[in-house]
């Protein structure tokens, strides 16, 4: 009888072990394959055993823990959405060489860590450079960027540009707009010199819907922030936005969970300029969206989807690009009348 009890106990334990492995394989095996994505993890790398997790937490560095949190705690809210965006908008192709542009803020730091992890486990090869431009940061701000890069184990390349000095000498206009335009040009140039064919920026879901509303309410036009676009000044270069589907609240949560402190706006012009048009307008859009969500919780996703479902037949006027002339609905209207 005693031997029988031992055999039954062993059988029960083996059964539990088999069930646990099946659960782990369902949870971690070929993560995001539902989207047909070229990324996979195996159950052996992600034990859900509590003791194993505790032991692993003691052995992992802060950078490794931050990376691991992407495919555990933030798997649904950040990782799967990044993978979905890369797949849906065809952002990354085999043998790409991508410069992840790091400003020091929460968005670009998260993007860099995501791209680092993705490169390790992608089913096809691509290369990543981690590019930091110093436009004239104060020593404490630059040190914070370098410290976060060390913590997250990101092999950054830092290059300097005179942007802050140039913008400081320009009178009139928007310093923020000029700075942003110059930044992108310098980033394209440096990335191209490194042999990259793409730069990756940290714009996210909230940036997209806020930009859409800003264009309507302040620009008197309907346009949005695209998930990728070709450079008009640097031949063969593209810009991609892998965080296109990731929400800002989840990015903030990831940073707090990993005890990270990121650079806020490091521009010295914020201290002496009373009103920054874009920052002010963007804050208004955030408040407007939050107010509308009190009455309709799907407002943000509906704004986002509206730009994926534009019906030109109902537009009074439209252009097919920045260089195109303005077309009127009357062009087609009068043609139908002649028919």
Named regions from a protein language model:
Residues 30-55:
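Short, Lys/Arg-enriched N-terminal segments with co-localized hydrophobic residues
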Residues 127-128, 207-288:
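Catalytic subdomain that performs nucleotidyl-dependent activation
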Residues 21, 152-153, 235, 258:
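Short, structured coil segments at secondary-structure junctions
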Residues 26-29, 129-131, 155-159, 240, ...:
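General small-molecule cofactor/ligand-binding pocket signal
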């Amino acid at each position: 009888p005693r031997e029988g009890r031992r055999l039954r106990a062993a059988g029960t334990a083996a059964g539990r072990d088999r069930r646990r492995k099946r659960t782990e394989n369902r949870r971690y095996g070929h993560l995001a394959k539902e989207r047909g994505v070229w990324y996979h993890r195996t159950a052996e790398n992600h034990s859900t055993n509590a003791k194993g997790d505790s032991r692993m937490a003691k052995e992992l560095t802060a950078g490794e823990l931050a990376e691991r949190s992407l495919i555990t705690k933030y798997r649904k809210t950040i990782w799967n959405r990044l993978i979905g965006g890369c797949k849906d908008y065809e952002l990354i192709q085999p043998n790409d060489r991508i410069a992840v542009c790091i400003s020091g803020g929460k968005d670009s730091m998260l993007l860099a860590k995501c791209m680092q992890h993705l490169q390790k486990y992608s089913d096809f090869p691509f290369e990543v450079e981690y590019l930091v431009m110093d436009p004239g940061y104060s020593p404490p701000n630059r040190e914070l960027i370098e410290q976060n890069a060390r913590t997250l184990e990101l092999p950054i390349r830092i290059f300097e540009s005179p942007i802050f000095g140039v913008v400081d000498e320009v009178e009139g206009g928007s310093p923020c707009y000029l700075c942003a335009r110059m930044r992108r040009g310098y980033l394209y140039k440096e990335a191209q010199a490194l042999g990259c064919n793409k730069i990756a920026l940290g714009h996210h879901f909230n940036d997209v819907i806020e930009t859409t509303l800003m264009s309507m309410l302040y620009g008197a036009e309907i346009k949005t922030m695209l998930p990728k676009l070709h450079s008009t000044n640097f031949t063969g270069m593209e810009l991609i936005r892998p965080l296109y589907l990731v929400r800002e609240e989840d990015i903030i949560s990831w940073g707090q969970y990993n005890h990270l402190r990121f650079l806020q706006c490091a521009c010295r012009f914020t201290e002496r300029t009373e009103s920054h048009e874009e920052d002010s307008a963007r804050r208004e859009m955030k408040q407007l969206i939050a107010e509308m969500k009190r009455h309709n919780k799907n407002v943000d996703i509906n704004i986002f989807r509206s730009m994926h479902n534009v019906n030109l037949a109902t537009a009074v006027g439209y252009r097919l690009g920045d260089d195109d002339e303005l077309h009127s609905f009357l062009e087609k209207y009068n043609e139908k009348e002649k028919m």
